[in-house]
Amino acid sequence: MKILMLGNSFTYCNDLDKMLAERLGACVVRNVRGGARLSEQLNPATELGANAKKLFEEKWDYVVLQEMSRGPVTEKESFMQSVKELSSRARECGAKPLLYATWAYREGSEKLASTGLGYKEMTQALHDSYHEAAQIGGCLVADVGDAFYEMREKADELFVEDDYHPGVYGSGLAADIIAAVIREDVKNG
């Protein structure tokens, strides 16, 4: 199985790609940059876009899409359009697109306060945007953000000190959820 992951630091923190490869016995390749938005993967004038263009010439089984942390809420139109276009490209190279739905910033953090949203409100807004994008792009969804919300009492393990990047436990949880979605899809054919 070959998996391509497109995203940013939420995808490369703690070598999430390697965690996913171990869980699935798959070849996992990532095309990432800290702070990147999915729209950069579509722009051949950027390094990410040029790399993505080459990567989409290969055959893949799954393409995992992860948007900048608050992008699905604050740049919703761009997010939806990027998912639509990247999902189409994924299918053209034989892959199923899968959205890695991320989480709200840590409850009570300054980072969360800077959004003007509460923890539950940001969690729900991200959930809604990712699921709307999944409908538009015909994507599978790995609801990692929902799991972070349900496990918020373990915030010290889910997050590192900056209150938004995942700790090793958080990345492991993400790998488990993405792997479970892929296994279920393979099982259901």
Can you name each region flagged by the protein language model?
Residues 88-98, 139:
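A short helix->loop->beta-strand "cap" motif at the edges of active sites that frequently abuts
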Residues 29, 64, 98, 140-142:
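Hydrophobic/aromatic beta-strand patches that form the interior of the parallel beta-sheet core
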Residues 5, 99-101:
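Structural beta-sheet core signal
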Residues 2-6, 10-84:
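Conserved SGNH/GDSL esterase-like catalytic core that processes O-acyl groups on lipids
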